[in-house]
């Protein structure tokens, strides 16, 4: 067992970890502190080098993913009842890494009609970026009881 991230403050939370495609980086959602400052964070397991990309409150999502080269990230957004308490967070988001150690956000799909509340019949979108970086794939429930898999073409949204 190996420690990847150590908390640095009271109320700091991290979660929903995922591996980079090459297996060298553990990525995770980081909040310092909870519900206030948001990051896409990663730690290289070979070197221990950490990287953080700050994201705004409305950019936060429950589940994140990355492209094979870790230059694109996506998440599934969230509603007002979730930890970010965002007022405009119900989007499938795409983030592009910038040379300045930041990311830019692109809103791909308006999820305002989607039911995020799994305890009330909803579904978690659980986004994925295709290996060719052309699509973001996710599950959506835009009408009661109708869960489907969707794909949004990244290039078409730009």
Name each region found by the language model.
Residues 1-60:
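Beta-propeller domains
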Residues 22-23, 69-70, 133:
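Conserved loop/turn motif of beta-propeller repeat scaffolds
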Residues 26-29, 72-76, 135-139:
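Residue position within the beta-strands of beta-propeller blades
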Residues 35-41, 54-107:
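Loop/turn-rich, solvent-exposed surfaces of beta-rich toroidal or solenoidal domains
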Residues 44-48, 98-100, 155:
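Short loop/turn segments that connect beta-strands within beta-propeller blades
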Residues 53-63, 102-131:
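Conserved blade-ending motifs and adjacent loop-strand segments that build the rim/top face
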Residues 123-158:
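Blade-level signature of beta-propeller repeat domains, shared across WD40, Kelch, NHL, RCC1
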């Amino acid at each position: 067992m190996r420690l990847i991230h150590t908390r640095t403050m009271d109320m700091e939370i991290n979660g929903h970890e995922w591996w980079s495609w090459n297996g060298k980086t553990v990525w995770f959602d980081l909040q310092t502190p909870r519900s206030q400052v948001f990051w896409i964070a990663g730690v290289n397991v070979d070197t221990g080098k950490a990287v953080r990309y700050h994201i705004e409150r409305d950019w936060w999502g429950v589940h994140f993913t990355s492209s094979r080269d870790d230059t694109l990230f996506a998440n599934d957004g969230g509603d007002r009842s979730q930890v970010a308490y965002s007022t405009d967070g119900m989007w499938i988001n795409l983030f592009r890494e910038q040379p300045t150690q930041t990311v830019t956000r692109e809103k791909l799909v308006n999820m305002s009609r989607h039911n995020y509340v799994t305890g009330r019949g909803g579904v978690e979108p659980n986004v994925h970026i295709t290996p060719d970086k052309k699509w973001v794939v996710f599950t959506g429930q835009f009408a009661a009881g109708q869960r489907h898999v969707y794909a949004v073409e990244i290039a078409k949204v730009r």
